[in-house]
Amino acid sequence: MSLLEVFYSLYKKRWNDITDAIIQEMGAPKDFASKLQTGTGASHTKSFIRYLKEFEFEKPLGDHAKNQRIIYEPKGVCALITPWNWPINQVTLKVIPALASGCTMILKPSELAPLSAMIIAELIDEAKFPKGVFNLVNGDGEITGDALTSHPDVNMISF
């Protein structure tokens, strides 16, 4: 949880950089890019942190089976593919839960809008998440997307 909080703090510090990247990627007006795009990513991140502080990753099955447990475990390697039109929104909706649940992930942003995802990669690195947990690949959907979605070591695909 503390790494996500560090990430969130760094995200807010790089707000203008993220906004500028979105303007370049989408041609979005500055207010739209800042408030709705960058702001949405911040809001999602903050909401996930708040939710995860209360989430029980292990709990009893129920009153009828007190010795049996429900244990939420990482899914494994996740391939996360995001579109160009909501770059930060989709990145945070995919990356933050994967980080929080302990999954290793490969993020492939749209080839039309990779800049904001590159900043997210920098923030994850700066927050000191373990090396190899987050991986960023750039490329087109036909080649890179196909490689990710057909790889036998990928346990989950989010598109």
Model-flagged regions — what are they?
Residues 57-159:
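Rossmann-like NAD(P) dinucleotide-binding subdomain of oxidoreductase/dehydrogenase enzymes
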